[in-house]
Amino acid sequence: FIGAILPAIAGLVGGLINR
């Protein structure tokens, strides 16, 4: 479960920072 949600959070946070 967590293994599938971590990538999603990392993608969202990374997108905001890399914005």
Curated annotation (Swiss-Prot):
Annotated tissue distribution: Expressed by the skin glands.
For the modification Arginine amide, the affected residues are 19
Q: Where in the cell is it found?
A: Secreted
For this UniProt record, give its keywords in alphabetical order, as a comma-separated list.
Answer: Amidation, Amphibian defense peptide, Cytolysis, Hemolysis, Secreted
Keyword Lipid metabolism found: no
A Gene Ontology cellular-component term? extracellular region
| Entry's Gene Ontology BP terms | defense response; hemolysis in another organism
In its keyword annotation, does this UniProt entry include Translocase? no
- Role of this protein: Has hemolytic activity against human erythrocytes. May have antimicrobial activity.
Stated name of the protein: Hylin-b2
Species this chain originates from: Boana lundii
